[in-house]
């Protein structure tokens, strides 16, 4: 293609799946470019060796497979959870938060290998194309970015399957013998889209769920756990200190076994359309409940309410792909400042899809049982003071009422 005639070497974000395997072959045949592959171990729960073997089978000489699980949770997931970030009230941003990390590594590998372009497998209809590319341009304004879904002649996944068969590219099959759903997975979540899921009126089949058992079949006995926090980040489970990735993986196990973290939603994509997806975020759902609980006793009311006001904007920036933007970094600085005293332990009960906070304690707690007790508070609070407080706050309301009744 004349558009990319000057491109000699491309770093491809490669999963080993249908789309990126076809993209790899397309880059070789249509552009005549040398392809370097990058596969990230984000905790998706798959063996990555098949991706290496498939890349080798397709003639790739430079193959990068990197374990980025700790970096992912430490530098991306945990900062996001300090903000309690949720998009449109329900989505915990599992796909969104992984894209800037992948772009960061693509840019690093392009520099290391002398590549003049990067490529990704995101479609021209979705959010991921925006997330990958905004992140890449923020890190290297001169990088060329190839998005084959916007350039090639394929119009459907059926055509992709035909191309794969023509070029003898293996395609995984699901339990029903068909090409799989469009799936994204990492240590934080998994998502499924496409096929019958495109009809939002129909319940998702049970076999779509990969990370959790059904709440109906979860154990009849509740699971009790304790999560410890320091400066807003989870650091331990049941008193055992764990690395960020290990901790999230363990929470995923607890969530999976108790049917926690399933979400069926229709969301508003950045590009303007609505899409339906089935998401599973077992560990993240538990972590969010625990973080909110420890904040409830350690954050001042003003700081807590300001955080709640900033959160939707912060979540939107991540969803739209602006992780490396100055405004996200400004918000992050404010959020991180609020977390200095967010430490302690939260006790949770996990039962049939539910996460229930049943206890919270902290050496930095602002909760005072002496102030709130219904019993004798030994002079800690003079209830007579409330009269003046109410009178001053009622001043403008009484003034308005006096005017309006005339």
Swiss-Prot record:
Q: What class of enzyme is it?
A: ligase
GO CC, any one term:
cytoplasm
Q: Which keywords annotate this record?
A: Amino-acid biosynthesis, Arginine biosynthesis, ATP-binding, Cytoplasm, Ligase, Nucleotide-binding
The residues the record assigns to binding L-aspartate are 123, 127-128
- List the Gene3D superfamilies hit by this protein, alphabetically: Argininosuccinate synthetase, chain A, domain 2, HUPs, Single helix bin
- Catalytic activities: L-citrulline + L-aspartate + ATP = 2-(N(omega)-L-arginino)succinate + AMP + diphosphate + H(+)
Residues recorded as binding ATP, renumbered to this chain, are 13-21, 40, 121
GO terms of biological process kind: argininosuccinate metabolic process; L-arginine biosynthetic process; urea cycle
Claim: Amino-acid biosynthesis is one of the keywords in the record: yes
- EC number(s) reported in the record: 6.3.4.5
Q: Could you state a single Gene Ontology molecular function term? A: ATP binding
Q: In which pathway does it act?
A: Amino-acid biosynthesis; L-arginine biosynthesis; L-arginine from L-ornithine and carbamoyl phosphate: step 2/3
Family membership, please give it.
Belongs to the argininosuccinate synthase family. Type 1 subfamily.
What name has this protein been given in UniProt? Argininosuccinate synthase
Species of provenance:
Brucella suis biovar 1 (strain 1330)
Q: What is the lineage of its organism?
A: Bacteria, Pseudomonadati, Pseudomonadota, Alphaproteobacteria, Hyphomicrobiales
